[in-house]
Amino acid sequence: MRTSYLLIALIAAIAAAEKYAMVFGTADGWGNYSITSDPCRTYDDLIKAGIKPENIIYMTYTSDLTYASNPFKGMIFTDPAPNTDGDWAKYGCFDHVDYTDKDINKKVFLGILSGDAEAVAKATGKENPKVLAAGPEDTVFTYFIDHGDVNMLYIGGGHINVDQLLAVLNTAYKKQIYGKWVWFMEACHSGSMFLNLPSDWNIYVMTSADFAHPAKMSNCPPNDKVAGKSLDTCLSGLWDNSYLDYLEQHPKTTIGEIVDAVMADVKKTSAQGVSEFGDMSFRDLPLSDFFGLLPTPSFRITRAAPESIVSLDQVPMHLAKWRAIRADKDEMASAVAEYERLAFESAKREVEVMRLGVSLMNEKAADAALKTASESYSASCVRDLSLALHEKCGHSFPFSESAMNLLRNICLPGLSVPNVNWSDICM
């Protein structure tokens, strides 16, 4: 009899458990097209997989839909195609956006993750803002895409560091506003955000890159054509499309199976180092426990292998080059001028990073430090030097892989931020 009661209780608990999801695409602009397209695709798949719209929190920009040079207003794509059948907006993702524009900032993001409705209401003016409010028996799936650097993520116009992210995850754990939580995160150096994630918080994370590498975009020019028209941007993230393609073809996959498959797939064309963190027992669980179960067979055809793969820090230069290549006579001068401007800025950043290096070590050591990353480093030192280069010299994020290599070699374990005369470094 006792066994029967326990079985009934277990079945009741499973039936009562809910699935929740959060989708974050927190960078704006046509050059960040994939930070709008892949979240839309993820949202649409979550709905197709049975997640209730009211159980999904969706943060994204929508300006790409009306961008002046967008040849397909109101549409969004992740793959090149001979027609517009691959438009993800037609499934309704943008009808369900909870946070956009000025509400995309670190205060709102951290408030959502920690279940702090009062803080989010104060920051947004929303009367009943959606925040994480699952229960201790519920599952949560989170997809995030934006730029990143070592121990930093960018949210809108600001950034958060690794300590802030781990603090809100700890708050959510203590508040019991989730049962089990799976994160899929796309950002350069995203692995650096979870190196110290405890394994007993019931959280599992797959990141698009390890601590040392930038992420890469795919379907960039010249592989950016839809219905015969060039979009002049990168349509998707390499890792993002890999996991979505695999999931749509293998809806009953376990977490371990999809992670292993994506690691192998991305490794064919990139050394970015897809990584995993947290509670490794999650690998045996069906991803459908978190994402829901997509229709079988897949509603999409198998896509071709990704092409035109570009490191995220090189995307602006790559896009400017192809705009100049494709420009007609009326647009040629301005397109080439923009490419020249970005080339000069890239050269300036490279020189300033090297000037920083030779101010702290000899020239041969600095040159070697550009080429190989130190595996052990002071995260706070790297963060502070990165921000100083941004604020003092005007460097843009994400930094190049070589620049991050140098900063990690400057910031060896136990060392504080060196004294730097930035007037001697910045040009």
Task: Please name every model-derived segment.
Residues 13-427:
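Cysteine endopeptidase catalytic domains of the caspase/legumain-like
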